[in-house]
Amino acid sequence: MQRFIKWLAVITSLDLLIVLLGGALVTKTGSGQGCGKSWPLCNGEFVPSNLSMETIIELSHRLTSGSAGILVTLLCILSWKYYKHVRETKTLAILSFVFLVAQALMGAAAVVWGQMPAVLAIHFGISLISFASVILLTCLIFEIDQKFDARSLIMDKKMKFHIYGVTIYSYIVVYTGALVRHERASLACPDFPLCSKNRPMPTQLHEWVQMGHRVAAMLIFAWILYAMILAIRHYKQQPVVYWGWIISFILVTLQAIVGILVVFTNASLSMALLHSLFISCLFAVLCYLVMLGTRSKVNAKEAASTSKQTK
């Protein structure tokens, strides 16, 4: 059974990643109304008779979201049953399921009633939490902790502050990026790093949205760089923290490069999807570090208790 659960966890993780990228594809191609204002049917039909490209994209996204719902539900039930001895299992299972349902309902509401761009931008963030929760659940199932000796990890307050702070802030950056997409502001500023050679400062809403995201992205790049330097200096003996921050910096660097290329490639589809891919992976890594941070306090208490007993 454990072998089956491992395969299920991998397939579920991949399916949720496809859902995330599919949502970005729907937004990028303007396919949100590919099935009209009909849900769960498509244009009022179970199998649509007229298949335009927008309809195919929207319908494919709905199907992958539906399959993800089934897989996540099954994974939550099995992990709850067979891995309940691991402290985080129940919490992650609940988060995976609840946020997947929330993003599905929000997606349906957007189709039927429509939503403001500011509200639609939350949709990607909700999906991201479900994805990260399933990734963490998969890590627990594959016992990644034991390979990195993460169960004995103890961090200082400074490192935990950076882990929690960067993760929370990354969610804000994700929201600003999703807002850029839903406001159709990807090309509002044709230059980089300033908005325009002739107008360095934004002058209208779309430019402010674009430049706001750029500033937020620059700050998270600098923050992750600083945290990585701390990890390299002080956590060489803790591989999971050491490599966690190095991987985070690699991902945020790739994210920044692709973000710049979005501007200079006229917001090409491939760059837009890569942009969503890298931020999804980065958020999952940061969430894993958060999970380790919550354990650190417990590990420190256990170490102190053991020390007292030996004395």
From Swiss-Prot:
Heme o binds at H61, H123. The chain crosses the membrane at residues 7-27, 63-83, 92-112, 122-142, 160-180, 212-232, 244-264, 272-292. It is found in: Cell membrane. InterPro entries: COX15/CtaA_fam, COX15/CtaA_HemeA_synthase, HemeA_Synthase_type1. Residues 28-62, 113-121, 181-211, 265-271 are extracellular. It comes from the Bacteria. The keyword Disulfide bond applies. Keywords: Cell membrane, Disulfide bond, Heme biosynthesis, Iron, Membrane, Metal-binding, Oxidoreductase, Transmembrane, Transmembrane helix. It catalyses: Fe(II)-heme o + 2 A + H2O = Fe(II)-heme a + 2 AH2. The active site is at E58. One of its GO terms (cellular component) is plasma membrane. Catalyzes the conversion of heme O to heme A by two successive hydroxylations of the methyl group at C8. The first hydroxylation forms heme I, the second hydroxylation results in an unstable dihydroxymethyl group, which spontaneously dehydrates, resulting in the formyl group of heme A. The N-half (TM1-TM4) and C-half (TM5-TM8) domains are connected by an intracellular loop. Each domain is formed from four-helix bundles and they align in a pseudo twofold symmetry manner. The N-half domain is the substrate-heme O binding domain and the C-half domain is the cofactor heme B binding domain. The cysteines of disulfide bond Cys-35 and Cys-42 may be involved in transfer of reducing equivalents from quinol in the membrane to the active site of the enzyme. This is Heme A synthase. It comes from Bacillus cereus (strain ATCC 10987 / NRS 248).
